Amino acid sequence: MLDAAVQMFSVNGYHETSMDAIAAEAEISKPMLYLYYGSKEELFGAVLNRELSRFVDAVRGDIDFTLSPKDLLRNAVVSYLSYIDANRASWIVLYTQATSSQTFSHTVREGREKIVDLVARLLQSGTRNPQPDTDFDMMAVALVGAGEAVANSVSTGDADVHDAAQLMINLFWGGLKGKPSDTQTHPATTA
């Protein structure tokens, strides 16, 4: 039932999808659908909770903090975009349909906060010489926002997952390297 709902919501949107259409897609009766979920709103909430959990669990499960910082970044980005590429309907429901609804945007926001927290921890673990005022949380917000924009292109088929991953890795790694610490040697300057 939830798989059918994901497909229908991703194609038609929340407001245009009927319980009749979801029941037909799931090959069950409409009363059976109402028996399990009560209303379209409850069904959509169940879809969001399941899809967010699957997404966060999949990305978290592919993170290995024992890797080098660059390999950790590569692994996280490839995992993130590969999941979206393999679950396009889910992404469309989560980040297009759900975010356009006041009723459900808080659920997506909670999922995004979990990803931002994970990215902030990745940044902290991979930073050798952080500046005292480094705001890993704000950096994570920026990276997740950029990642969502790229993910939207992947989910619509406008971007190849491997090309998009390489672009994100190059962009993020160049920015994350930061400036050298004061203890590293600097080229001699002449006055």
At which residue positions do the language-model features occur?
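Hydrophobic alpha-helical connector segments
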Residues: A46, D57-A86, M139, L143, ...
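C-terminal peripheral helix-coil segments that are non-catalytic and often amphipathic
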Residues: S82, D117-S125, A146-N152, T156-A191
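Short secondary-structure transition hinges
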Residues: D71, N75, L81-A120, N152, ...
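Short, hydrophobic secondary-structure boundary micro-motifs
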Residues: I92-Y95, P132, T183-T185
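Generic hydrophobic, amphipathic alpha-helix propensity
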Residues: M1-V6, I22, V47-E51, F55, ...
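Amphipathic alpha-helical packing segments from all-alpha helical-bundle domains
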Residues: S53-V56, Q102-R128, D137-V141, D163-Q166
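Short coil/turn segments at alpha/beta junctions that flank glycine-rich nucleotide-binding fingerprints
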Residues: V11-H15, T66, N87
